[in-house]
Amino acid sequence: MNKKIQDFFLSCKECILENPRSFYGSFSLGPFKNSQSLTVANALRRTLLAELSNIAITHLEIEGVTHEYSTLVGVRESVLDLLLNFKGIALKNTSPVTKPLFGYLQVRGPGVVRASDLKFPPMIQCVDPDQYIATLNENGKLILKFRISDFKNSQENLNFEVSKTFLNIPNFGHFDTSSFQNFENSNFFSSSFFASQKMIKSKRKTKFSQLKVDYLSSFGFSTQHKRSGLNQTQKFAMQHQNPFRIEKNQQDFNKNKNGNFDSQKNKTNSLWVDPLFNPILKVNYIIETIEPMQKNIPNEIVFIELWTNGSIHPRKAFYTALLYLKTMFDKLDCMRLLNYEFSNTMLESEKTSTKFFKTFEYDFRFYNSREDKTMKSFTPEKFFLPEEIEDVEKDYLLNLKNQADNTWNDLPLTNLNLPYRITKILAKNNFFVVGDLLKISPNELKKLSGIGNYCVFILQKRFEKLGLKLGSRNEKNL
């Protein structure tokens, strides 16, 4: 068996960096038997496309944007286009990411915004700094904050709600000018940039408006306005928002005396980017025969080629997929098949259920220690369960056997399909159910009138098919 395992080989044919966001790798693996090559190739391809994960930008919060269908003044791209551009940004981390991280972007036009303008945490790097994000004209400005997370943290916080201090940017009037990309337009905060908002006054407060005030108050929103009625711009925006999304801040834009405005009064919402965590772009495989097809002789090689987004080397991605499959099958090797009813009985006790799950929990140290032993000897090792679980198993099997015995005790002999003559003779000797024969030995049965060796032989054959034995109940009592 050692010779068969040593016959396998893995070779990296070539790895080519086609562009910063496309890293190509080609590998060969084999030889396999005719029935194994397709299984291995398909398993590797599905693992590469489904099980590998990386970090990505998950949420955006853009200053002045409340929903995905908004547009920004002075920005060529719509908010949907910005979300798609951020979705395509490939990131890699120099150290493990254990919690969500945040980055920033503060630029103004005219100019082109690229990934190099983003401010990332020290442990995060952008694969392609020249990746395009947006184009701004003279009146354009783009101030946003984005969240970076891995797949695990993203699933735990899928219903992510941004706190009211998420943007956490001080008064825009006190910004350091060095934080912006371009400042050619000196009248960026001019009064013409923010048009005055017209108000619609309601003649009287109706019953419906009172219900509206009570409804909004239940969410903690302020219902006291300087003027009755809703702003036209507010009303239009609220009609086109997701009805299940609550705005982070319900206050209007207010200019201050210096022509600036307070960022705490801006309407902002966290926008879901729908990130792509898998760094694998595409996987292909080809199965080739290296010699004439022969039965049960390894003669097929699997050629696999894959493309990554540049955040991971193809060789590392391929080895990670192999390690994932190996770990999964190691679990199956150590798994113990348990009867469904036995597992239910065992899990009724909180003490045994806790130890049961801890026993089968994946532990790197456990599998590393087993790996050395497995390489030396390929005989399967016994997987031991805690003593408490073994005691529960013994009790369960004993109860199951007692229940089975009780079932056979009441089974009529007519259900055994015995010859009519034997059934009639047993009935004359007061044997009507199987439990009656379990109490008497074959020698004692032969002493009865009308029962000979042939009759005992037929009964023993019928009982063996049921897993029973003549006189077994009498032997236990002795």
Swiss-Prot record:
Family label: Belongs to the RNA polymerase alpha chain family.
Segments for region (Alpha N-terminal domain (alpha-NTD)): 1-341
Protein EC: 2.7.7.6
Region listing for Alpha C-terminal domain (alpha-CTD), in residue ranges: 365-478
Function: DNA-dependent RNA polymerase catalyzes the transcription of DNA into RNA using the four ribonucleoside triphosphates as substrates.
Keyword Nucleotidyltransferase: yes
GO annotation, biological process: DNA-templated transcription
Enzyme class, spelled out: transferase
Domain notes: The N-terminal domain is essential for RNAP assembly and basal transcription, whereas the C-terminal domain is involved in interaction with transcriptional regulators and with upstream promoter elements.
Compartment list: Plastid, Chloroplast
Pfam short name (any one): RNA_pol_A_bac
Keywords: Chloroplast, DNA-directed RNA polymerase, Nucleotidyltransferase, Plastid, Transcription, Transferase
Record note on quaternary structure: In plastids the minimal PEP RNA polymerase catalytic core is composed of four subunits: alpha, beta, beta', and beta''. When a (nuclear-encoded) sigma factor is associated with the core the holoenzyme is formed, which can initiate transcription.
Recorded catalytic activity of this chain's protein: RNA(n) + a ribonucleoside 5'-triphosphate = RNA(n+1) + diphosphate
Name of the featured protein: DNA-directed RNA polymerase subunit alpha
Cellular component, GO annotation: chloroplast; DNA-directed RNA polymerase complex; mitochondrion
Gene Ontology molecular function: any one: DNA-directed RNA polymerase activity
